[in-house]
Amino acid sequence: FTDTESITASTMVVTPLRGAATHDLVLDGGHDLFIEKVLIDGQQANERYQMGQGQLTIKNISKQSTVTIVNRIVPVNNTSLSGIYMSRGAFMSQCEAQGFRNITYWPDRPDVMSRFTVTIHADKTLYPVLLSNGNLVAEGDEADNRHWVRWEDPFKKPCYLFALVAGQFVAREDKIKTKSGREVLLQVWTEEKNYPNSEHALESLKKAIAWDEERWGLELDLDRFMIVATDDFNFGAMENKGLNIFNSRYVMASPSIATDTDYQNIESIVGHEYFHNWTGDRITLRDWFQLTLKEGLTVFREQEFTADMQPDESSRPVARIHAVPAR
């Protein structure tokens, strides 16, 4: 990353289907992608790819091959806010439903699932915090006051669950032990001014993780789980695997002015996005027609969580009644 543009290098290992009518690789591409080069097994492939309307076709991938596409994007000009965009000095992403194609050329469908390893390079002063999905596996410094980090998500996911955040944020964090005894790190990243208002979001995340273990036997499957709450996120809330992103208005609570309803709403919203870790992320969609399945099931789990967080059993029906007009 620089403050004006980003160079994206995506490398994918592609295996053709046996008996397929064609061995052409057709990738989706959005607006304002500027190709620098295309490589197949490390060799330039200028004669083997064609540009079409919203597509890049690479001809005759007849055996397992490593395809690398290097392209430029300009997040500061991305006013659609789909893909990676820049707002007030921070980079962030929104890829549901078809935003990943605005980052690089890719088979942008929910039934295409891949394991992602993401390396981010940026200026250390402007972008001290570099986040993506999964577990942090390596980091280091570079020349010219730059640094890099590498994130690895061990689980296959569709590209709409990819996330990236780079900017100046501070973290409220804690460590917990899962039911199986693993220690995991929980972090809520915010702009510095919002740090005092982030405590309830972290406590809500802890409650959601514990409840999912006890009620459904579903344990957090990563070494860390992160929430980013920023004033500049455009989507309200998004369940990216291991890196949930929220607009801060939905998860920040000032102890001096927040009401009981505010606290309950934050608990429900944080719970909802965390519960997608299994119902939506690990178990995902075949196509976008199934959106109602992952959202409906997760809303049900959220409502059960909210009811179970009530002070006594008699309050469960009240929580159910309140949930009806909300949905």
Feature-to-residue mapping (PLM):
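Hydrophobic alpha-helical and helix-loop surface patches within well-folded domains
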Residues: 151, 180-327
